[in-house]
Amino acid sequence: VHFPLRSRQLRLSLLASSLLIAMSAQGREKVSVDLPAAPLGEAINALAQQSSVQVIFASDLGAGRNAPAVKGRFTPEEALQTLLKDSGLQVQAKDERTFVIVAQGAPASSLVTPSVPVEMAQMEITASRTSSSLVSATRQSTVLEHEQLQELRQGSESLATVLAKAIPGMSDSSRTITEYGQTLRGRSMLVMVDGVPLNTNRDSSRNLANIDPALIERVEVIRGSSAIYGSGATGGIISITTRPAGGENRAETSLSATSPLTRLGSDGLGGQFQQYFAGSQGAVDYAFDFGTRHIGASYDAHGGRIAPEPSQGDLFDSNIYNIGGKLGLHIDENQRIQLAVSHYDARQDSDYATDPSVAKLPAGSVPANAIKGLDLDEQNRIRNTLVNLEYENLDILGSRLSAQMYYRDYFTRFTPFDARAVATRGGNVDQIMQNSEVFGSRLTLRTPLGESGSTELVWGGDYNQERSDMPLDVFDPAVYDASGGLVFDKTGKLTYMPPLRTRSAGAFAQLQHRFDEHWSVDGGLRYEYSTAEFDDFVPLSESTAASPVAVKGGEVHYDALLSNLGIVYSPVLGQEIYASFSQGFQLPDVGIQLRNARRGFDIGASNLEPVKTNNYELGWRGELGSNTLGTLALFYTTSKLGDVQSFNNGLILTRTKERIYGAEASADWLSDDAVWGAGGSATWMRGREKPDGKGWQDMTGYRVPPLKLTAYVQYKPTLEWSNRLQATFFDAKDYRLDGVDSFGRHQVSSYTTVDLVSQYQISADDKVSVGIQNLFNRDYYPLYSQLLRNNNNTSHLPAPGTVLTASYTHNW
C-alpha cells in the first residue's frame, strides 16, 4: 500500500489508535455528519475527520469527481455511499472501521497493483498549509485525535507530558507549568490553536499550558524547521485544533478524578468537569463548551509533597476555568464563515512555598523542600482570551481560499524570586508578570495549475502585531528573610520590560507537483519583514543609582527570505523515500535584551539579528510486512546565530553558531485480529555550538535531550475493552564542559517511566477510563530538574510518584 505522509499519518494514527482507543463500533454506529458539496477527495477527507474511520482509495479515483452535500446521522458506510452516489464508485468494508473505495464492479484487491498508488483519507485542518491531497510530504509528523489524546491524558498530568511521551524528537517535559527546555529536535516549537499562534516575542514558555486538553479535537506535530506560518518553528510546529461546530445536535459530559497513591488525602485530590455541546440549525452551526478543573498537590515516590517550582512556576493547588463557543454560517455550498471565542483562566491558591535554605547545600544533593505558611496574595496565573474569525470559499476563480483574523489577550504571573544578587533586576525580591495583546491575520489560497490536476500553487500572506510589557511587584526583603521565605509584603511596582511593539508581515508561495505515481516534488519561498520598537525607559539596573539614566527608545527592522525544496520517491507501493531542505525563522527576542539593558544600551548595536536555520532531512516511511508500519528520519540543522541565551539571570547574554544532527525511528505493529499491538520509537541527537573565540562544544541539556526510547503494548480482548502499557526512557548524559557544572550543564542520570491505561465502552454512549501514571512508583528526577534551572536545590524537584486517574464520559 502506498501512503504519502498525510496518508501515513492517518494510517499510523489509526493503526496505533486501534490499540490506543476503544473504537468498538465506529463502523456500525451512526455518527453526526455535516459535509458541504465539495470535490470528492476533500469530502472523503472531511468524513474521515468527523467519523474517525480509515478510508483507502486510489489517488486517481477522486480526480474530476464532486460529492454532494451530506448532513444528518449515518453510519460511516452509509455516509460514504451517499458521497459516492452517481460517481461510478462503490465502497467496500474491509472491517468495521476500514473501508475501500473502488470502481463499481471491481474487487478491493484491484487496489494492490504496481501502478495504482493508494491513499488514506486525510484528516485535514481546513486552513492547513502543511498538508496536501496532491503530493507526499517531505517531513515526519504525528497526529493525535481527540479520543486518543483523552486516553493518553490518563497516564500524564499535562499536555506537555503527553506530547513528550508520544512524539519522537521531543524532549521531556518539566512536570510543571513551563515548557522551558522542552525542545523539538533541539530547537523551538511554534504552538498554534486553530491557526492562532501562542508564541509571543518575549516567550513566557507557557504555550502548552494555555489551553485545556479537554477542549482539543486534534494535535498535529510536524517536525523540522519550517517558515510556512512565519516565525517560531525552527524545530517544528504543534498545530492544535479545538472541538468542532456543526453536525447533528449532540452533547458530551466528562468527569474525572485524580489522586496520588503515595499520599492519600484531600490535598492531593484533583478533578475535572467538562461539558460540550455542538449541532446545527439550517445553515447555522454551533459549538459551546465550558468546564472547571482543580489541580491538587503533587507527591513524590516517597509520599513527600513536591515543592513549588521557583523559577518558571507551577500549578499545584490551582483552579482552572474554561469557556468557549463557535458560531458558523454556511453562506452557500462553497462559502462558510465562523466566529470562535474562548477564555481560559488558571489561578493558583497555595499555602506552600519552597524552602530557600536548601540552596545553601551542594547543588543536586537534596530535593527541593515544600514549607507551609505561604502568605502571597497573587500567585501563579495564566489568563488567555482568543477571538478568531475564519472564512472559507471552496471556489473563488478556481482557487480555494481560507482567510483568518484573530485577537489574543494574554496575561501570566510567575512565582516570586529572590533576585537581590541580580543587578539587571534591581536587586529585589520580586514577582514578574507579562501582558501581551496580539492582532493578526492569515490568507491562504490553493490554486490548481494546468488541466491535468497534477500541479497546485499554495500561496498567501500573514500579518501579526504584538504589544507586550513585563511589570514586576517588589516585596519587602526584611519581611521575606524573617519569615524564612514565606511572607511577601508588596512595597511597589517597577517596569522590568517596557512596552514592546512588534509587527511582522510575510508572503509565501509553495508549488506542488506530482510527476507520476512514483515521484512528487514541492518547493517554495517566503519573505518576512518585521519591526520592533519601544520608548525611553529606566532599566532596573539603574533603579538603585543616585541619578538613574534612561535607555533611549528606538526601532529595529529585520527581514529574511526563506526557501524550501523536497522530493519524494515511491519505488514500490507501500514505500516512500524523501529528501528535503527547509529553512526556519525565529524573530530575535528583543524583550530579553530590553529587560537586561544597562546604561548606554543601544538597540542598533544589540544582538538582534533573527535566527535563520537550515534543515536537511532524509527519510523513509513504509510497510514492514503486512502488519507493521515504520518510519526513519535523519536530520541536520545549522544556524549562524542561535537564540539569545540568558545565563545567570541575564548577567550574560550570548549567541553562538549552532549545528544539531540526529535520527528518529518508529514502528507500529497490529495483529491480524487487532487484539494485540505493540510499537515504539527511538530518538538520538547531538547539538554543537561555537561561541565567539572558542571551539565547538556540546550544547546544554535544555536544548538537546539525551537518547529517548518509547515503547507500548496494547491488548484489546473485546471490542469494548482496551488496555495499554507504555514506557518512556531517557538515557544518562554528562553535559558538563571539562567536568565543570554550570547553567544547563550537569551530569544527568537515566530514568524510565511506565504508565498503564485501561478503557471500557459500557454502551454506545458511556465510557470509563482508568490510568496509572508511574506504575512502579519510580523515584526519579526529570531532565529539567536534574539541570537545576535555578542553579541550586530549589529547582531539584522529584517527579510525581504513582498517580491514579479515573474518568467517565457520557454522550447525550
Q: For each predicted feature, which ranges?
A:
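Extracytoplasmic beta-strand/coil segments of soluble accessory domains associated
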Residues: F99-V102, T126, A160-P197, E217
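Short acidic/polar hinge/loop motifs at secondary-structure boundaries
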Residues: G181, V196-R223, Q275, F647
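A beta-strand signature from Gram-negative outer-membrane beta-barrel systems
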Residues: I211-S254, N811
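Gram-negative outer-membrane beta-barrel transporters
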Residues: S254, E517, S530, S626-Q645, ...
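Transmembrane beta-barrel wall of Gram-negative outer-membrane proteins
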Residues: G265-D300, G304-D351, R383-L394, E451, ...
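Face-selective signature of the C-terminal outer-membrane beta-barrel domain
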Residues: H330-Y344, N380-S541, V568-S570, L629-L634, ...
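Membrane-embedded beta-barrel scaffold of Gram-negative outer-membrane proteins
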Residues: E390-E392, R400-D418, V568-S570, E576-P588, ...
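C-terminal beta-signal and adjacent terminal beta-strands/loops
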Residues: F635, F729-R736, Q759-W812
